[in-house]
């Protein structure tokens, strides 16, 4: 699977988890907490592989603004995750923060799958996208062996470098 297919698959997986969460809203605190943790783990690992491998592969003069915006969006998402990690699903504000998290992720996905995917197709060959996909998947799988959500609070001071 090439890098773009992998990233899109991860986006779709998180979108599916958000949909499950919406159906549980205001019910089943333990299940909602578990879904949040699954979402946070996936988003934490996903942001890490994008910042460490995908975005650097796209760094050119004409992509710099889009990449800066992407890492700022990641920072905003990480800050919400850090806030949610300090809360319980039973807290009054939990569902509202989850909704904001979902909206920010959806916005980021829309821009990334548009502007950055277009840039990737222009800048990287098929072989480069394939190789990058392998690297992204291996790193993601390694991160997911742990609980990557727990690394997120340490990444909330400033946006990742590009």
Where are these regions (language model features)?
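Small-residue-biased structural context
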Residues: 1-162
């Amino acid at each position: 699977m090439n890098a773009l297919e992998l990233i899109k698959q991860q986006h779709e997986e998180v979108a599916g988890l958000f949909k499950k969460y919406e159906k549980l809203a205001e019910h089943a605190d333990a299940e909602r907490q578990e879904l949040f943790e699954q979402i946070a783990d996936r988003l934490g690992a996903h942001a890490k592989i994008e910042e460490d491998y995908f975005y650097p592969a796209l760094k050119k003069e004409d992509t710099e603004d889009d990449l800066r915006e992407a890492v700022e969006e990641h920072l905003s998402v990480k800050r919400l995750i850090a806030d949610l990690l300090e809360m319980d699903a039973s807290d009054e504000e939990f569902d509202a923060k989850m909704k904001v998290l979902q909206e920010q992720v959806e916005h980021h996905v829309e821009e990334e799958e548009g502007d950055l995917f277009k840039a990737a197709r222009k800048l990287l060959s098929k072989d480069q996208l394939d190789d990058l996909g392998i690297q992204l998947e291996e790193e993601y799988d390694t991160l997911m062996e742990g609980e990557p959500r727990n690394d997120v609070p340490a990444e909330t001071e400033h946006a990742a470098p590009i």
